[in-house]
Curated annotation (Swiss-Prot):
Gene transcribed to yield this protein: DRC8
Task performed by this protein: Component of the nexin-dynein regulatory complex (N-DRC), a key regulator of ciliary/flagellar motility which maintains the alignment and integrity of the distal axoneme and regulates microtubule sliding in motile axonemes.
Pfam families xrefs: EF-hand_7 (PF13499)
Protein known as: Dynein regulatory complex protein 8
EF-hand domain boundaries: 95-130
Organism lineage: Eukaryota, Viridiplantae, Chlorophyta, core chlorophytes, Chlorophyceae
Organism: Chlamydomonas reinhardtii (Chlamydomonas smithii)
Location of the protein in the cell: Cytoplasm, Cytoskeleton, Flagellum axoneme
Length: 166
C-alpha cells in the first residue's frame, strides 16, 4: 500500500473512532447534528469557527439530499471530515506541551504555577475566536480545580498534541 493510501486509511480510522464515540444509539450509524463539532475535535484537531461552519454546511447539504433530520450518518460524516482533515492538515495540528506552557506562563507573571479560572474565562470569551458558554463550561470542568485555579502544567499536558499524526 502506498504512503498516501496508508495516510488516508489512518485518517478514515480516526474519523470512524470519533464518530462511534458520539453515535446516537449503538449501532445506529448516526450522530446528533449538535454533536458534530465535538466529534470532529475528537479526531484530535482544533478547527476554527469558520472551518467548523464549512464542515457543518457540507453535512447539512448532504443531509438535505437524504432527508435526514437532526442526525448525520457515518458515510456523510466520514466523507466530509476525512476530506477536510486531509485538505486542511497543516492548519489543524494542536500545539505541543511546551508551546502551551509558554502561553500559560505569559498569564502568570508571578510564576505561581496556576492562573485564576475567572481571568482565564474572560480571556477566552473576549479575545480572538470566543468560546460558547457551553464550550467554556465543559472546558472549565476539566481545567479548573475546586478553588478556581488552573494548574497550567497539568492542563497544558491534557491539551497538548498526543503525538498522533493525521
Amino acid at each position: 500500500m502506498s504512503k498516501l493510501n496508508d495516510k488516508h486509511e489512518r485518517v478514515r480510522a480516526r474519523v470512524r473512532e470519533a464518530f462511534i464515540l458520539f453515535e446516537h444509539k449503538e449501532g445506529s450509524r448516526l450522530v446528533d447534528f449538535k454533536d458534530v463539532p465535538t466529534a470532529v475535535r475528537a479526531c484530535g484537531v482544533n478547527p476554527t469557527a469558520v472551518q467548523m461552519t464549512h464542515i457543518l454546511d457540507q453535512l447539512a447539504a448532504l443531509n438535505a439530499e437524504t432527508d435526514a433530520t437532526g442526525y448525520v450518518g457515518l458515510e456523510n460524516f466520514e466523507l466530509v471530515v476525512c476530506n477536510f482533515l486531509i485538505q486542511q492538515e497543516a492548519s489543524l495540528f494542536r500545539d505541543d506541551y511546551h508551546t502551551l506552557l509558554r502561553a500559560f506562563r505569559a498569564f502568570d507573571p508571578d510564576g505561581r504555577g496556576f492562573i485564576d479560572a475567572e481571568s482565564f474565562k474572560s480571556l477566552l470569551t473576549g479575545k480572538g475566536e470566543a468560546l460558547s458558554e457551553d464550550e467554556l463550561a465543559k472546558m472549565m470542568t476539566v481545567a479548573a480545580d475546586g478553588e478556581g485555579k488552573i494548574w497550567y502544567e497539568d492542563y497544558a499536558q491534557r491539551l497538548a498534541n498526543d503525538g498522533r499524526t493525521i
